Amino acid sequence: MIPRTALSALLYASTSFAVCTKLEDCPQFEALKTDECQTYHHFLARGSTSPYPGHVIETVGKVCNALNTKENPKACGYEDVQYWAMNGGERWCISSHEGAMNGAEQMRNYTARCPDSHLIVMGFSQGGSVALDVLGGGGGPLWGCTQEDNPPMNISSAPGSKGATLIFSQLLGLN
């Protein structure tokens, strides 16, 4: 279970509006990108057509600022969920499925290497859909295409039992 401090940091950070999307435009966050074992490790799923790491990097920075301490300055970091991040019909379905499969595999690999880490999954826009599909399974018809199925994570075992999720999205189709 992630301690209250981490959850408080997540909730606090979720109120910020992220504007930095490209890592080269945000050098202050470069040190957070790692695949090394950490106490808290984010998996970021960017929005459609966004560059890596995407819209949630500033939120990750705030969360990590709250979790990194003098005693453990590298307690928190992130890695990008690797996927195409494209929109529009069939491209969305292919991209989302790729993200869900890759995100789940990245989390499994990380947990195998770093079994004591707490996992935080963050997604924005299409990345929010990818994050939900990673954790809960996905697939089916959407916007004129059919996304291939992917299985949900087992919440009784790692990595499914080790995560917290934060999704940023927009409501679609509301008039």
Describe the role of every protein-language-model region:
Residues I2-P3, L44, V81-G88, F124, ...:
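Broad hydrophobic/π-residue packing in well-ordered secondary structure
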Residues S8-A9, V81, G140:
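Intrinsically disordered regions, especially transient/low-confidence alpha-helical propensity segments
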Residues M1, A13, L67, A164-I167:
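Generic low-polarity alpha-helical segments
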Residues M1-C20:
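Fungal secretory targeting signals
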